[in-house]
Amino acid sequence: MSDLFSFNKEKKTKIINNTYSAKDIEVLEGLEPVRKRPGMYIGGTDLNAMHHLVSEVLDNSMDEAVAGFASIITIKMHQDHSITISDNGRGIPIDNHPKFPNKSALEVILTTLHSGGKFSSNVYQTAGGLHGVGVSVVNALAEHLEIKVYKQGKLYKQSYAKGEKLTELICEEAPKRLKGTSINFIPDPEIFGDKIHFNPKKVYELARSKAYLYRGVTIEWECEIEASSDVPKKALINFPNGLKDYLSSKITPDDLITTEIFSGNVESEQDGIKLEWAICWQNNDSSAFIQSYCNTVPTPLGGTHEQGLKSALLRGLKAYGEMVGNKKTANLAIEDILETASVVLSIFIAEPTFQGQTKEKLVSQGVSKPAENIIKDHFDHFLSSNKTIANNLLEHFIAIAEFRLNKKNEKTISRKNATQKLRLPGKLADCTRTSPEGTELFIVEGDSAGGSAKQARNRETQAVLPLWGKVLNVASSTLEKIVNNQAIQDLEIALACGSMKNYKKENLRYEKIIIMTDADVDGAHIASLLMTFFFLRMPKLVEDGHLYLAKPPLYRLTQSNKTYYANDEEEKAKLTDKLSKSSKAKIEVGRFKGLGEMMPMQLKETTMHPEKRSLLKVTLEDFQNVDKIVDDLMGKKPEKRFQFIYEQALVKMDKIINELDI
C-alpha cells in the first residue's frame, strides 16, 4: 500500500522547482508569443480560429473602404489553399518608421504586435480589426506571406515565413493607376495541422457580410477551389440597400407578420455615430436572431448598441399602445418583442471599447442613448405610418406576453416529487442526484420504450422522459402550435432551461440530453424531429455540447449461447461473416422492432451503460449551413425538400457508380 501513490509523488517532485530565479523567466520576443500561444490571439487553432486570420486582413481593407479611401476589395482563393486579399486604398506606408529608423513602416506593422494606423484617430475615424493586434498575428501564423503595396507608380513587395523576414523591401516600377495593398498568405500547418484549409463557403459568406455592412464597397470574388454549388467561381458582391438587402436574403417572405422591413441608415455628426438597422417579425421564432456589428466587427454578445435598439423598440411600442388605448401593452417586455424578430444592427464609432480580447461585446459609453433616440424616432414614424402593420404587431406581441406571464405563474420545478409537479403524461422518471454534473436525460418515444429504459437506468444519474403524442416538426409550425404541443411542453419543462432568447444554460437540469429512439427508419425520423427542435429552439444547448444520440442495436446474433449485437445491415453482415469463419455452429439472427422489445438488461448493456455504449455527439460547426439544410429538409416548402433529397440521391448514385468494378 505504501507504493500505491509512488507515481504521483514522483511526478509531483518533478514539477516543483525550489531554485526559482531569473533564468526561469522566459522572454518571448517579436512574434514568438503568437506562435507559442496562438489561442491567446485568435481563440484557438481550429478551423474557426484559422478563419479569424482572413477576418483580420479583410477588416483592414474594410477600414480603408469605410474611411473613404477604397472602393474595391478583391478576394481570391487559390488552388494551393492560400488566399489573396487586396484593396485599392492608400496602401500601407513604406517609409521608415520614426521609432525604428532602420525599418520601413510596412515591416514594423508586419513584425510588431499592437502596431498600425487604426490606433490613431487622425488616420481612421472608425476602425475594426478582429483583436486590435493587426496583420502581425496573421504573419506570425502564416507558413508564407507576401505583401505588395502600390503607391505613386511604384510596387513595393516583401516576403515572410512564420513571421520571419525572407526578403528586404523590393521596389519596382508599376502603372500609376494602381494603388492599395495586396496580401497573399497560407496558414502554417505546424500551428493548424495539415488537414484543415480555408472553407470557400465560410469565406464567401464573410465577404458578403462585409459588403452588406458597408454599401459603398464592391468585393470582387474569385475561387479556384472546388466548392459547394452555392459558392460561385467569380462574383461581384455589392449591396446598395445594405442591411435591408441582407435581411431580405435571410428570411422567407411568406412567414412575415409585416409586409415591410423596418430599416434605417442614419449618420449623426452630433453624436459621432453612424447607425444602420433592419428588423422584421415572423409568425414563429424558429428563424429569430440578432446580429450586431461595430465598425464591421461582429459583436455576438451584444453591448451598448443593442441596449439602445431594445429600449427604442420597447418604448416605441408602449407609446403606440398608449396612443391607441390598448392597456395590455403595459405588460410588454423586450423579450416579447424579440421572440420572433430577425434583427441586424451595425454601428460605426470612433475608438470603440470592447469587453475582452476577442471584441465580442461593445461596452462604449455614450452609445446606448443616441442609438435609442435615433431608432425610436424612426420606429414611431414607421408605426404611425403603417396602422395595419402596427396593430398586427401589437396583437402578436401581446399574445406572446400573455403566454410568458402564464408560464411565469407556474410553480418552480424541483427534483423532489418531480412527476407530481411536472404533471407529465409520460411520467418523468428523474434521477436522485440534485446537481446537473454527471446526470443524463434519455428522451424516448412512448411508454413501452420508457418502461424498459426506466428499469435499465442508473437511478442516481440517469433520468428517462417518454414523450407521448406526435413529436412536432417545429421548422414548419407556427409559434402557437409549438407552445401548445404536449411533447414539446413536457420536454421544455423537464429541461427547465427555457428556449430561444429565454434560454439560460445555468438552469439546465442535466449534463447530457440523449435522444434514444428505435434503430430503424421510424426511429431516425423521430430523432431528426427532435434534433430540429433543439437546433431551432435551443441552439445554445447544442453548441455547448449537451446533445447526444444513442446507438441502440437493430440486430441480435446468437451463436453457441453467446450473444452479439449489430447496429445496421452492414455491421450484421460483417459480424455474420466473422462468426461463420470462427465456428461452424448455427447463427440465429433476430431483429428488434423497437426499444420496448429489448429486455432491460439488454438495453443497459448495449445502449445505456456509460462504459459499454456508443454515443454520437451532436455538434454545430457551420450554423448558417445547418440552418439552410434544416430549412430545406424540414421547412414548409416541399419543393425545397424534393430538391435536397434529389441532390443527395445523385451524390449517392455517383459514389456507387465510382465504386463499381466494371
UniProtKB/Swiss-Prot annotation:
Site entry (Interaction with DNA), positions: 470, 473, 525, 641
Enzyme class: isomerase
Binding site for Mg(2+) 2: 518, 520
Top-level taxon in the UniProt lineage: Bacteria
Binding site for ATP: 20, 60, 87, 129-135, 359
GO term, biological process aspect, one: chromosome segregation
Cofactor note: Binds two Mg(2+) per subunit. The magnesium ions form salt bridges with both the protein and the DNA. Can also accept other divalent metal cations, such as Mn(2+) or Ca(2+).
Keywords, ordered alphabetically: ATP-binding, DNA-binding, Isomerase, Magnesium, Metal-binding, Nucleotide-binding, Topoisomerase
Stored CDD domains: HATPase_GyrB-like, TopoII_Trans_DNA_gyrase
Catalytic activity: ATP-dependent breakage, passage and rejoining of double-stranded DNA
Residues noted as binding Mg(2+) 1 in the record, renumbered to the chain: 445, 518
SMART domains on file: HATPase_c, TOP2c
One example GO MF annotation: ATP binding
InterPro entries (UniProt xref): DNA_gyrase_B_C, HATPase_C_sf, Ribosomal_Su5_D2-typ_SF, Ribsml_uS5_D2-typ_fold_subgr, Topo_IIA, Topo_IIA-like_dom_sf, Topo_IIA_B, Topo_IIA_B_C
Record-level GO cellular component terms: chromosome
EC number: 5.6.2.2
Domain Toprim residues, every copy: 439-553
Cofactor or coenzyme needed: Mg(2+); Mn(2+); Ca(2+)
Subunit and interaction comment: Heterotetramer composed of ParC and ParE.
Record-stated family: Belongs to the type II topoisomerase family. ParE type 1 subfamily.
Function: Topoisomerase IV is essential for chromosome segregation. It relaxes supercoiled DNA. Performs the decatenation events required during the replication of a circular DNA molecule.
Name of this chain's protein: DNA topoisomerase 4 subunit B
Protein species of origin: Rickettsia bellii (strain RML369-C)
